[in-house]
């Protein structure tokens, strides 16, 4: 399943989202969801402990000036890869 997180991690129940995930799932951080991937944050630790692949939309990182503060453990992608993720997963859930 592809999960997308577009809200700030302080404005949603990130632990609940992660409890729904399983190995092989992907999570894409976009819009304010990219805040969850800030280096050194507690939210990042939650993400890294989940059995999923993590991605973030480059345009949203750049729009928020976060490129230099973002974890290198999350793959930064463009819109073409976003489309590939949607094609890969039949089911999607937005948070």
Swiss-Prot record:
**This protein's UniProt keywords:** Cytoplasm, tRNA processing
Q: Where in the cell is it found?
A: Cytoplasm
Q: List the InterPro entries hit by this protein, alphabetically.
A: DsrEFH-like, Sulphur_relay_TusB, Sulphur_relay_TusB/DsrH
* Superkingdom per UniProt: Bacteria
Among Gene3D superfamilies, the record links this protein to:
DsrEFH-like
> What is an annotated GO biological process for this record, any one?
tRNA wobble position uridine thiolation
Q: Where does it sit, as one GO cellular component term?
A: sulfurtransferase complex
Q: How does it assemble?
A: Heterohexamer, formed by a dimer of trimers. The hexameric TusBCD complex contains 2 copies each of TusB, TusC and TusD. The TusBCD complex interacts with TusE.
Member of which family? Belongs to the DsrH/TusB family.
Q: State what this protein does.
A: Part of a sulfur-relay system required for 2-thiolation of 5-methylaminomethyl-2-thiouridine (mnm(5)s(2)U) at tRNA wobble positions.
What is the protein name for this chain?
Protein TusB
Q: Which organism's genome codes for this protein?
A: Serratia proteamaculans (strain 568)
Q: Gene encoding it?
A: tusB
